[in-house]
Amino acid sequence: MLGQVLLTVESYQWVSTPQALVAVAVLLSLIAYRLRGRQSELQVYNPKKWWELTTMRARQDFDTYGPSWIEAWFSKNDKPLRFIVDSGYCTILPSSMADEFRKIKDMCMYKFLADDFHSHLPGFDGFKEICQDAHLVNKVVLNQLQTQAPKYTKPLATLADATIAKLFGKSEEWQTAPVYSNGLDLVTRTVTLIMVGDKICHNEEWLDIAKNHAVSVAVQARQLRVWPMLLRPLAHWFQPQGRKLRDQVRRARKIIDPEIQRRRAEKAACVAKGVQPPQYVDTMQWFEDTADGRWYDVAGAQLAMDFAGIYASTDLFVGALVDIARHPDLIQPLRQEIRTVIGEGGWTPASLFKLKLLDSCMKETQRIKPVECATMRSTALRDITLSNGLFIPKGELAAVAADRMNNPDVWENPENYDPYRFMRMREDPDKAFTAQLENTNGDHIGFGWNPRACPGRFFASKEIKILLAHILIQYDVKPVPGDDDKYYRHAFSVRMHPTTKLMVRRRNEDIPLPHDRC
């Protein structure tokens, strides 16, 4: 999950600990090793050396070289491989096995998230809410966040317009813009409008929490993975990052709790008077509607939404904008499409769907550089044997490599960025559905593959199209001279580098975007 998050992680030293605790950690690891059941016989790419007591070195190596190892192996092999990762052992399957893998009910994403992000510990409240049996977060994302799009598309566009002007300026001279940093701020503000509403989305303290909590979660989660699970409930109390994480959660509650209490009191008063309560167009309202009186962690739910939505959307927004800037002959056709479609239909989900060239550009960016080199990570709830005899032990991770997205047997000239690739695919009735950014299949698993696909991809697609449309109409963009491709590779992640920049200048709008139309 997170480019800037993961870069920030590397600036932290792993927590130093008393010798006694280290000795206990080693002892527990050895005991756990002895108690293991049947193990996979699959080759381990980065095995522990015979003289090593722990897998620490192997885990650190995977953090550094994981994407390169996975890409190198699956570019030449169509068979699975096992790695030691920072969560333990993980079997990576080739994408040719994705169809079978996605249908295995006992490969559980929630178990992976609960273990990897320590949902039982204070500070990881967002992941505790995600992993609740009611799956309230998933229901809100899949249902209301999609069905309510006609109500929030125009407010999203209005906020984007105002925010972009502040971040990118009004100078008509070429200037260097920190496009990743600006993109992160832009996505944070637009996401929070739909998450917590107009009142809180302008609260600078909340924006700071929304943007930085994910960094704190990733840092603390990684530090704790050094420890055996039995020691983590003790270790986190002594780590500075753990204190910071818990403080962010406390601050979040001080902002969110009064607002939800106000809304509940407002609703009760309206019901008592026999009048219709106000209906807010944000996830705070939709969580209340979906919970239907059942208890849930209000602040935890919002922190979960921010963690899931901000950094992944920022990565695709920045990646798509950089790719477009590197192909100047693409900008005028995109502007013409935006002017025509938005000029005729205004800011509606239907209009965003008609931005077919922009959609194709975004999907091609994701094909060239998926945000993870292996997706659909899940934990086995029982011993699992696949149809080819591959054994995945209970409690171990498995994932699917994204190798098919750059396979020359699937794509013509896969190494080349072709912005019209998926637009052409839409002309084929058999491929028109899967050619759209929001839809998934085995050839393009940038968002995973149903039922293991990212549930927030529908919102992300609309949000990013709105942001790109504003940028392209209002600004000229081009690469910074001498600025080569810069990706940040870490463990499973391949992200746009947080230092990514572009040259921008304000342009005179010949056809203003019609914010006065729905």
UniProtKB/Swiss-Prot annotation:
The record places the following residue ranges in the Lumenal compartment, namely 49-518
How would you describe this protein's topology in the membrane? Single-pass type II membrane protein
Which UniProt keywords are present, listed alphabetically?
Endoplasmic reticulum, Heme, Iron, Membrane, Metal-binding, Monooxygenase, Oxidoreductase, Signal-anchor, Transmembrane, Transmembrane helix
Q: How is it used?
A: Compactin (also known as mevastatin or ML-236B) and the intermediary metabolites Ml-236C and ML-236A are inhibitors of HMG-CoA reductase involved in cholesterogenesis. Their hypocholesterolemic activity might be useful for lowering cholesterol levels in the blood and reduce artherosclerosis and coronary heart disease.
Annotated heme binding sites: 454
Name the cystine pairs. none
Q: Which InterPro entries does the entry link to?
A: Cyt_P450, Cyt_P450_E_grp-I, Cyt_P450_sf
Q: What would be one Gene Ontology cellular-component term for the protein? A: endoplasmic reticulum membrane
Per the UniProt entry, the Enzyme Commission number(s) are 1.14.14.-
What family is this? Belongs to the cytochrome P450 family.
Purpose of the protein: Dihydro-ML-236C carboxylate monooxygenase; part of the gene cluster that mediates the biosynthesis of compactin, also known as mevastatin or ML-236B, and which acts as a potent competitive inhibitor of HMG-CoA reductase. Compactin biosynthesis is performed in two stages. The first stage is catalyzed by the nonaketide synthase mlcA, which belongs to type I polyketide synthases and catalyzes the iterative nine-step formation of the polyketide.
Record's protein name = Dihydro-ML-236C monooxygenase mlcC
Species of the source: Penicillium citrinum
